[in-house]
Amino acid sequence: MPQDDSINWLASARGENYDRPNEAVTKIAMLIDAHVHLDKYGDLLDQALGEIDAQRIFTVATAMDVPSYLELQKIGERSELVLPTFGIHPRRAAEYVDRLPELGRYIDISPAIGEIGLDLHWVKDTTTYPAQRKILEYFIAAAGEQNKFVNLHTKAGEKEILDLLVKYNVRRAIIHWYSGPMDILQEMIDFGCYFTIGVEVMYSDYIKDIANTVPDHLLLTETDNPGALKWLKKNDEIGMPSAIERVVEAVAAVRRSTANQIEALVQANFCQLISNDPHLKALRTLMSS
């Protein structure tokens, strides 16, 4: 990772206390990709990181499990624009439900939490649902105790997840790729959750409705790449970081705005999400003047 006299992002990512209070930096316009699986790029990782740095795409790199997070930590050392975060995806929950003390160690060192959540739709094995719920509550309780934001997968578990956020007073939550009921969407909005709009906004009228419903101050963008486009289009397309530009343009069209306005709005919202975050001091220096 490039080192700089004014910013030591790696120290913050490792949970170390590093800050230079009252030191202003020039605010730089950035795209925000608030949910990505960078460890899945394989041989295309160098190209992906090149796009992230060249196009100034701040990237929240979400983990699926412990090996995923360890790989993301290494990737995060290569770019100050990558935030590695630890989580256990609901598909992996059954593998980790009896290993909570081990997970606690990684939660402690991760500056934010994700990907976590419930998947009671695409995961057909209902015997895994109790493990999903136990893992999720463990992470949300820890996020509340440690004051960390969470990045949530909510498919068919939207109301349960909202109830846990309320129970543990976790106010800084990113709801990733929301596609659930509109009434629960409104409840989550009322609670103050942020929502990422991703590549499906280019193809789905329902997602367009969601993109148009989320209030300005809670809007974020994502790609969920490299696999989201492949999953949506049922082809072999590998989604690269630059796809976030198409997402921004599509969101702008839906909201009758401009790409520049949406980019600025999303950056401001992400800055608000991390404002006063004790774990992300250096990131605030990077992102705001």
Please state what every model-predicted region is:
Residues 2-289:
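Mid-domain alpha/beta scaffold segments of enzyme catalytic cores
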